[in-house]
Amino acid sequence: MFDSHDDDLWEVPSIDVNVPVEAAPAVETVPAVETVPAVENVPAVEPAETAAPADAVAPAEDEPSTDDYAQAVAEAPEDDGYDMDGLDGKLLEHFGGKIVRKDLTALMKRGANVPTFVLEYLLGMYCSTDDEDAVAEGLERIRKILTDNYVRPDESERIKSKIRELGRFTIIDKVTAKLDEYKDIYVASFANLTIEPFVMPAEYVRDYSKILQGGIWCIMSIEYRHPMEEEDEFGMEVFGDDAPRRSKAKRKKRGPEDSPFSVASLTPIQMPNLDLDAMIDERQYFSRDEWLNMLLRSAGYEPSELSEKERLHFIERMVPLIERNYNLCELGPRGTGKSHIYKEVSPYAILLSGGQTTTANLFGRMNSMRADRVGLVGHWDCVTFDEVAGMRFKDTNAVQIMKDYMASGSYARGRDQINADASMVFEGNINDTVQNVLKTTHLFDPFPPEFNNDSAFFDRIHYYLPGWEIPKMRSSLLTGHYGLITDCLSEFCKEMRRKDFTHHIDRYFRFNSDFNWCNFNHIVSPFFPLILLTLLNNVHNVL
């Protein structure tokens, strides 16, 4: 029988996810904006005292990124030293445990095809220090964890066998659970480890509710118990000539509770929650430019290489992540890293490569079961169409449904009227100078014919980001300084989506009779997200 206390078995690394972050003092005042309310504290994570287990498995991931940002990372020179600046010192002081050196991210990303937010969470745990020796030791620990414990889809059967042979094995994978209300159990499954659904202990669901909300990357110790021998109704083992007949008569359908796999321990390697109020409280220690630079560095960019206008263009790319039902269009030259924010920074955004999808995939199936009733717009915070020239819908009503959704945040499918919050981003390339394009056509020309001349569709876009004003990605645009781990940044954006400040615009602005509702909506929608991202000081009192 398996002994769970066997010293030869690997243990999950001791990671303390319950260390509270000290709340910073009150937020300084900014004339035109008032403050945002508190949210619970972000648990800071401390590095484990012991070395990472040799059997921990790293999470399976998508194919290597081919976007322009990733190309710039691959071409970046090796770092031969690190010089801290004043902003680095402030981040170490006020966001310890939730920051990482972005040059280390680029270094690790070259050899580890792991989600950036998972990689940076590990870097934040083991390398959030200015001690170079400790950083080097932390990097080796992370490499070992990812090498030994990361579950790759093509190695799933090998990992399953290892769990069986050892009795217990530690893995890194994304786990998702849902409640089976008829059996009163939580049924879980992995993203990459192909085992049948199993029972998730209720305490983990209570502690980490994100397991129920799309899943969470975790370090988990998985146990295996050998199934009991099947017995007949008299308690005798089934064998001989009667075995097939009697076994078939007695056989019952197996469920999650019959799975030989079970979770012995679970530790998130994503932020399980974020204290928005504590993060906003730290804003008072940063000037407007420092806060702006911190956001850019957190996304991987070096602000000292950008002009003021370029910095704001990069910040604008974040707006769909913090504002619900926001429609952004960015068209410009190739190689400006349009998709990086939505592909690598936020796990709540989905990038549709080639821009192709179906009406059912995007907006759900008509009159279907609840699980399929809402499409991508109901499951993601941001849906990004990459290469808008490739947008194609076989359903002729798709464009009308999309226009309805972009205008109101709701749409009709069959008998149902469905509401959703996802923002939409449209990206594409302009292969000529703006001057030449304007001589023959218009700036929405890259869109396909069914959209190209539809003014009602373009009227629903809140912001047109001029991609020709953004520099092409190069190695010098990649920061080597400290920034928030991308998971912290994405959770900040996620929490900010829950807040609505648009009704406070009347306290600071008056619109004359020339503004209709569409004009008003197009001004308000980009205004407050940009205020929140760049100022944020005194938004507490606004509520």
Language-model segments: residues:
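Amphipathic alpha-helical interaction surfaces
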Residues: 324-327, 531, 535-539
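Cationic, low-complexity basic patches in intrinsically disordered or flexible, solvent-exposed regions
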Residues: 47
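Conserved ASCE/P-loop NTPase catalytic core
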Residues: 302-436, 441-445, 459
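Phosphate-sensing "switch" segment of ASCE/P-loop ATPases
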Residues: 417-424, 429-536
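Extended acidic low-complexity intrinsically disordered regions
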Residues: 2-17, 21, 39, 61, ...
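Extended, charged/polar low-complexity intrinsically disordered regions
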Residues: 68-298
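Intrinsically disordered, low-complexity proline-rich tandem-repeat tracts
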Residues: 20, 25, 31, 37, ...
